[in-house]
């Protein structure tokens, strides 16, 4: 799986990169069909947005969360990703 990071109007720190990689590694088994994930971090005034663009065979989708803290946004968007993939596997 390829993971790309993009930061818009904010700095991509090692802490943020490490956090993302740890969360993705923890979800390893459920992400086996995923080919590429793009993590996009955006900061506008006090709003911090985390977006995931997920590409897998036959389907691409995007998830986004916005809070006042980047780690909260990341946590919520990774939780959304996990719920979405688990839900689709149950079908």
Stretch-by-stretch model annotation:
Residues 1-91:
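N-terminal, polar/charged subdomain of small-to-medium soluble alpha/beta proteins
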